[in-house]
Regions:
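Acidic helix N-cap motif at the loop->helix transition within catalytic regions
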Residues: 16, 38-47, 87
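Receiver (REC) domain switch/active-site residues of two-component response regulators
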Residues: 27, 49
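Short aromatic/hydrophobic "clamp" motif used to bind/position activated sugar donors
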Residues: 75
Length: 88
């Protein structure tokens, strides 16, 4: 099982594409939203991700929090402005 973890804040313009790029790869997609004031969470949920809301402290804490929700044997971190390519 593969868990894809995405840390995000105010990324409504890119989060949907990031999630779509891993939909066929991931068994679960978890987005940690660090307090967005835009529609990042709603877009992520509609794209199929589980959204965890948490006030942003720092990048490392957000990643560690995301890992506590993951159930996969493998964890893949993807930044919200990145895309997994088909060759991945």
């Amino acid at each position: 099982m593969i868990s894809v973890l995405i840390i995000s804040k105010n990324d409504e313009d890119v989060i949907g594409d990031a999630i779509k790029s891993v939909n066929d790869l991931a068994d679960e997609i978890i987005v940690v939203d660090g307090g967005s004031s835009d529609k990042t969470s709603e877009i992520a949920e509609k794209a199929g991700a589980r959204v965890v809301k948490n006030k942003f402290k720092n990048f490392a804490d957000q990643r560690n929090l995301a890992a506590t929700f993951a159930h996969g044997d493998w964890i893949f971190y993807l930044d919200s402005d990145e895309r997994a390519t088909p060759r991945f």
